[in-house]
UniProtKB/Swiss-Prot annotation:
Gene Ontology cellular-component annotations: cytoplasm; cytosolic ribosome; cytosolic small ribosomal subunit; nucleolus
Record PROSITE patterns: RIBOSOMAL_S17
Coiled-coil ranges per UniProt: none
Superkingdom, taxonomy of origin: Eukaryota
NCBIfam families for the chain: uS17_arch
Family statement: Belongs to the universal ribosomal protein uS17 family.
GO biological process: cytoplasmic translation
Record-linked InterPro entries: NA-bd_OB-fold, Ribosomal_uS17, Ribosomal_uS17_arc/euk, Ribosomal_uS17_CS, Ribosomal_uS17_N
Descriptive protein name: Small ribosomal subunit protein uS17
Modified sites of kind N-acetylalanine: A2
Database matches in PANTHER family: 40S RIBOSOMAL PROTEIN S11 FAMILY MEMBER, 40S RIBOSOMAL PROTEIN S11-RELATED
A Pfam family matched in the record: Ribosomal_S17
Length: 155
């Protein structure tokens, strides 16, 4: 069962907690629902076997991934289930026929599947419906960062 540390009872949408168990089927398997987000991303083991409840998770919640798939570097991971990533890009200045470096910070929902997301990790994110005022993307994959290199990285 999920950790009940919120005021409201935490329960996964679409799962009946009072369902009768037939012989040969474990009750734990009936109390969890997970799905495949598609687009070549595998469902993490933690999403299938875990006990967390997150309605904004792309594997166990009611959020669909559609639209853009982007990458970025984690800048901050201080919020609960939300991280800030930095996306670097080059902007062309016609007057000087040169490129200039620019960046954009984005708030991204990070499911409890990815427990050990740290500053400097490279994340792949997918677009979904607006989850809050500033969050419109969900983390789909985490790769460990290279360490201390130059801050600007073009993807």
């Amino acid at each position: 069962m999920a950790d009940q540390n919120e005021r409201a009872f935490q329960k996964q949408f679409g799962v009946n907690l009072n369902r009768k168990v037939k012989p040969g089927i474990t009750k734990k398997k009936l109390l969890r629902r997970s799905r495949d987000v598609g687009l070549g991303f595998k469902t993490p083991r933690e999403a299938i076997d875990g006990t967390y409840i997150d309605k904004k998770c792309p594997w166990t919640g009611d959020v669909r991934i559609r639209g853009r798939i982007l990458t970025g570097v984690v800048r901050k991971a201080k919020m609960q289930r939300t991280i800030v990533i930095r996306r670097d890009y080059l902007h062309f200045v016609r007057k000087y026929s040169r490129f200039e470096k620019r960046h954009r910070n984005m708030s991204v929902h990070c499911s409890p599947v990815f427990r050990d997301v740290e500053h400097g990790d490279i994340v792949t994110i997918g677009e979904c419906r607006p989850l809050s005022k500033t969050v419109r993307f969900n983390v789909l994959k985490v790769s460990k960062g290279q360490g201390a290199k130059k801050s600007f990285k073009k993807y």
